[in-house]
């Protein structure tokens, strides 16, 4: 045993790896696994920085864009119906504008059609009402004429306000006349001549005793005034229909605020 131990010591002494400068090679590498694992652990949570609020907002907007595009490509039923009715209105109004220009099919009748439209203008009606009011000598006549004057002024202000708000152009590029500028009847919606004709005809039918033929002629006159505005290209069909409706409601409003004979006499005396 002592001989074998001395032999082993001599073998270890003669081994090159037992020298001091080579001792590190005999030991297993320490910390080699830890840096790798620590590197993995460190690289795990720091793969990507947390998204900022701006990036999240942009991502959210990019997700919403296809939905908005789908909404535009697939409009609602109301939008389709409205656009269809608008297209029909424009098409039919252009077809009925047979006196819209010098090259139109009924260009020779343009002067006569414009004359029919002038009968529904506000300036002649206001001037005629004031003239009749000055010449009237009865209290009943003055009461009717004062309320008619109130209705005409209400019509001009209502139509001018709605036209200024909507600013719809006519089917043809026709410039308004001097009388149109005086009554602020510049745009197409609603048709001021149509609203005035409807209001005046309803006013006369309610407060004047007229024979049946005159009543029929009064209604036909209001219809022809509205049609003439479409024929010369100043209004669409829906503009005229809206004018008729507004004229009727104006008449109902005047009936609600009807001025009595005493009030009319006070206004006349003050004037």
From Swiss-Prot:
This protein's major location comes to: nucleus
Outline which residue ranges sit on the Cytoplasmic face. 1-112, 163-202, 261-271
- Mind telling me what this protein is named? Inactive phospholipid phosphatase 7
Its biological purpose is as follows: Plays a role as negative regulator of myoblast differentiation, in part through effects on MTOR signaling. Has no detectable enzymatic activity. Knockdown in myoblasts strongly promotes differentiation, whereas overexpression represses myogenesis.
Q: Which residues lie in Polar residues bias regions?
A: 24-36
S-S bonds: none
Determine the domain of life of the protein's source: Eukaryota
């Amino acid at each position: 045993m002592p001989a074998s131990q001395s032999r082993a010591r001599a073998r270890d002494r003669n081994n090159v790896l037992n020298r001091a400068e080579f001792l590190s090679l005999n030991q297993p590498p320490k910390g080699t696994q830890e840096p790798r694992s620590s590197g993995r652990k460190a690289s795990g949570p720091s793969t990507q920085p947390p998204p900022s609020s701006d990036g999240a907002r942009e991502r959210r907007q990019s997700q919403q864009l296809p939905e908005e595009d789908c909404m535009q490509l697939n409009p609602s039923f109301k939008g389709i119906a409205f656009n269809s009715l608008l297209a029909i209105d424009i098409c039919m109004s252009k077809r009925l504008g047979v006196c819209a220009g010098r090259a139109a099919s009924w260009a020779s009748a343009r002067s006569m059609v414009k004359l029919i439209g002038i009968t529904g203008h506000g300036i002649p009606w206001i001037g005629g009402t004031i003239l009749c009011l000055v010449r009237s000598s009865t209290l009943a006549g003055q009461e009717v004429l004062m309320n008619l004057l109130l209705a005409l002024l209400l019509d001009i202000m209502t139509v001018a306000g709605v036209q200024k708000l909507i600013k719809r152009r006519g089917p043809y590029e026709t410039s308004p006349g001097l009388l149109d500028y005086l009554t602020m009847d510049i745009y197409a919606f609603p048709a001021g001549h149509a609203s005035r004709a409807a209001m005046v005809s309803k006013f006369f039918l309610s407060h004047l005793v007229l024979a049946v033929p005159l009543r029929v002629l009064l209604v036909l006159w209001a219809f022809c005034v509205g049609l003439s505005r479409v024929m010369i290209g100043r209004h669409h069909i829906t503009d005229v229909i809206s004018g008729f409706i507004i004229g009727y409601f104006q008449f109902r409003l005047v009936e609600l605020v009807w001025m009595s004979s005493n009030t009319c006499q006070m206004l006349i005396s003050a004037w």
